[in-house]
C-alpha cells in the first residue's frame, strides 16, 4: 500500500488574462522532506505557492495535507493549517519595528500587570489583576511585552546582524530579508515555504540556515525550498520539482542529477555557467570619487573616506557583506545620496551633491538593489517603465504631449531585445505583473538603452533564474566592451570574480582590500568581507590609494 504524501497538490490550474500560470500541475511533498522547486522566472513557482498559502484561489485542482482536503481562501487559513511562508518580495510594514513585524498577526497572550513592571506598575493590584483589564491587554496589547528577547535570540542564532527594536524602514534590503526569515522561524509550522530565502545571505549565514532547516526536518517539518541557486539544491534538497512555462517538467532526486541537468530542465536548452570576458584595454577615467564620506538613512556614517576610480571599458566589482556601505556607495555614485565629505566627478565634471537628474543627464545609469521599490513603478505599464527616465527626449514628444506610438515601439523593442517574458501588450501589462527576473531584465534594458558612460549595477542578478543571470551578465560585459565604465556591487563572489577587472572589498564603510580576478583568493576575500583579514588594517591603508590610482 502506497503511503499518502504529507502534501498533495493535484491538477492545479491558475490562469490570468493572457497567460496560464499553472497548467494542471501536480506536486507531492513527504513529511520531513526538503523539496526543491525550480524554474525560470515566470515558470509558475510563485503562483503555485501563493495558491498553497491562500493568497490565490486555484481555478481547478485539489490540495490535501495529511490526507485531509484543504480549502485555502486566505493566508490565515493556511496558517491555521500549519503552513508558513517566507515571500520573495517583502511583506513588511516599514514604520513598525522588526519585533513588531515578526509578531504581527500572532495571538500573543497578554503579559499580566505586575507591581514591579514598568507598564502598569502605577495601577492598584485590584485593577492589574482584573480579568477584564487582562482581556483588554491581550486585545489591544496594553501592557503586552513584545517578545523581543526570543526574536533577538533567533536573530543571533542565525547570524543575522540586526537590531530587533529598529524600524524596518531603517534597514537595508538584506536585513529586511532576514526579518522575513525570522517571521517564519518564530512560528511553529508543519509545512514551511521558503521563496528565495538566501538571496541576500552570506555563505556562512546560508550554511547556518541550512543547519536549522535540517533540524526542522528532523522534527518532521516539511519544507518547500524555492531557489535559483543550483548549488543550494545539491546542498540541502532531497527531491526537486522543475516547472517550465507553467507546467511540471518532472520531479527527480537530487542525487540522480547534475546542475547542468537541472538547468537544462529549467530553460529547455544547455546553459553556460561561465562567461567569456574578452580582454579590453581600459580607457580614460569616467568616475573619480575622492575621500567620499556619507551617512545612512539614520544619520550614521556609512562611508568613510572612500576613493574609487572607474575607467571606460572596465568593470570594478565591489564585494562585501550586506549592510557595510554598499547601498550607500551605489546611491552616492548614482546621485541619489549626498556626501558629507569628499568630491565626485563624472567625465571630469564635478557632480558632488548634484541632483539625480543631473547625474542622469551626464550619462549615469543605475540598477538599484530593490527593483520593486526603487527601480520601477509597479502600477504603471511596461511602456511607461521602459521610458521612465527619458520622457523629456524629443523622440517621445514635445512640450506637454507624448508620442505614445513611439513610446510603445521603444518598449516593445526592449522587451524583444532582452527577452522580457510575460508581456503580451506593453500598454496593458504593468511592472507589477512581471516576475522578478523579467522585471530585472526590463530595468537593465531601460538603463542600457540610454547608452550610458557609467553603469552602476547593485545586485543585478539577485533572485533571478539561471537563464536570466546568463543574459544579464552578458549584457553587462557587452557594455564593458562598448566602453562603458561599470560599477558592479554583488554579494555573489563568483559573479564578482567572473565579471570584474578589479575587485574591491568594502567593510564597515571603508575599502579594505583590492585584488584582481587572476589573483583572487576566495578565502582571503571572505575574511576581508567580515573584517577578519590578517592584514585588514594595512590593506585598508594601502588600498585607499590603490582604489583611486589603478
UniProtKB/Swiss-Prot annotation:
Domain ABC transporter, residue spans: 7-270, 287-533
CDD domains: ABC_Carb_Monos_I, ABC_Carb_Monos_II
Cellular compartments annotated: Cell membrane
Protein keywords: ATP-binding, Cell membrane, Membrane, Nucleotide-binding, Plasmid, Repeat, Sugar transport, Translocase, Transport
Cited InterPro entries: AAA+_ATPase, ABC_carbohydrate_import_ATPase, ABC_transporter-like_ATP-bd, ABC_transporter-like_CS, P-loop_NTPase
Keyword Oxidoreductase: no
Family of the protein in this entry: Belongs to the ABC transporter superfamily.
Effect of inactivating the gene: Mutant with a disruption within tsgB13 or tsgD13 cannot use glucose for nitrate respirative growth. However, the mutant can grow aerobically using glucose as the sole energy source.
Membrane topology: Peripheral membrane protein
Gene name of this polypeptide: tsgD13
Name of the protein this chain belongs to: Glucose import ATP-binding protein TsgD13
Source species: Haloferax volcanii (strain ATCC 29605 / DSM 3757 / JCM 8879 / NBRC 14742 / NCIMB 2012 / VKM B-1768 / DS2)
Biological function: Part of an ABC transporter complex involved in glucose import. Responsible for energy coupling to the transport system.
Catalysed reaction equations from the record: D-glucose(out) + ATP + H2O = D-glucose(in) + ADP + phosphate + H(+)
